[in-house]
Amino acid sequence: MGHGLSCSRDTDEYDLFRAAQLGDIHALSALLAADPALARRATVYDRFTALHIAAANGRLQVLSMLLDRDGDVDVLSRKKQTPLMVAAMRGNTECVVRLLRGGANVLTFDSPRARTCLHHAAYYGHAECLQAILGAAAQAQGPVAASWGFARFVNVRDERGATPLHLAARHARASCVRLLLDKGAIVSAPTAVYGFPGSTALHLAARAGSMECIRELLAWGADRLQRDSAGRIAYAVAMRRGHRACAALLNPAAAEPIVWPSPLKFIGELEADAKALLEAALMEANREREKRILHGSDINIKGGDEEEESEDEEEACNICFEQACSMEVKECGHQMCAACTLAICCHSKPNPKTLLLHPPACPFCRTTISRLVVATTNSNKTNSRRRSRSRSSSFKGGLSSAMGSFSRIGRGSGRLVVDGSSVGELADKPDHDFSSVAAAAAICDT
């Protein structure tokens, strides 16, 4: 008789887990109505509950029903993994959001490597899940703010000293790298033993051969000269792995990339549309640098006469006279293109010890820039445009000399020894890019 009851219970458990896997809400409801205790049963080996199984398979209705029945949102499997971790691994964003809304703890660590749900989302490259978790962690009244603080959570380490940024870079998850950097991940933090002791995200991206991750990391100020515990820079790692294109970008002899000016307070306060314009200008400038490094020649990208004429109908930038004005200094109302605005913001480098950066000044009126917005278009600005051009004509001599001085940055040649052998073919320094708009920054020093 006892054997019969045991078989019946095992069958009910199997049916429950099967219904959770397939999303059969009606079968699940019937089973739980007959025996509510089934909701707490777990599989024999992995100790997955129906909640884990629903989260892993993206069964949102089943998940919601189980949570509404007072299911334990942070129930642990054999490896101490929560349903939130499982959903983040599988990229089931809707389930992640529902679990977070149900009070799932983002600070739970699993047992294999002491990783959080943030680690798992970054490792598997699920940027939407990552965004949802970071959004929940950023809540002012949430448990992260009360105990850890958001900045510490973004840079949380596993037992091998790897942060979510390290995992994303090692597995070439460029969208996750971008998101984590934007949320405050420390770009040059070293690992303890993960990958190779002392590796930064740049070392790990070089090991993976991910050009996209390397672009993102360099644009956020990753140090090409930082060494791991064996004394290797990221360039040496890329060369050893045979990723020659990555090595060309990482070569310390090559021109430095333009770095996102995150230390500036008003950069952190940019509205989404203004931030998107500046980010696009940054990536375009660094892609031009990349082309020069990889192809060894200047690439002149200009539109035809028709395109130039259509741009001229808009308010042209009075610094480069090439692009339409897209950014406006809020205090004084002067306008520039996104590329020139970025050149001004990136001209001065922050103090590496304090990361302090003095705010730049408007190149036209010398007002300290404290806020940037997207420029408002107005077709009837002929008079103001003429006045602005006449005002900027006094800068033309300085612009020419500044362009020359900026273009010489990074010029020359050099050789770097990697593992005892010199690599000369990749060590020639190309001209510094961004010279067409770098003159804008020189105005700030006059």
Swiss-Prot record:
The keyword Secreted does not apply. It comes from the Eukaryota. ANK repeats lie at residues 46-75, 79-108, 113-142, 160-189, 197-227. Keywords: ANK repeat, Metal-binding, Repeat, Transferase, Ubl conjugation pathway, Zinc, Zinc-finger. InterPro entries: Ankyrin_rpt, Ankyrin_rpt-contain_sf, RING_XB3-like, Znf_RING, Znf_RING/FYVE/PHD. It catalyses: S-ubiquitinyl-[E2 ubiquitin-conjugating enzyme]-L-cysteine + [acceptor protein]-L-lysine = [E2 ubiquitin-conjugating enzyme]-L-cysteine + N(6)-ubiquitinyl-[acceptor protein]-L-lysine. Residues 376-401 are annotated as: Disordered. One of its GO terms (molecular function) is transferase activity. A zinc finger (RING-type) spans 317-366. Pathway: Protein modification; protein ubiquitination. Its EC number is 2.3.2.27. It is an enzyme of class 2 (transferase). PANTHER family: ANKYRIN REPEAT CONTAINING (PTHR24173), RING-TYPE DOMAIN-CONTAINING PROTEIN (PTHR24173:SF90). This is Probable E3 ubiquitin-protein ligase XBOS31. It comes from Oryza sativa subsp. japonica (Rice). The gene is XBOS31.
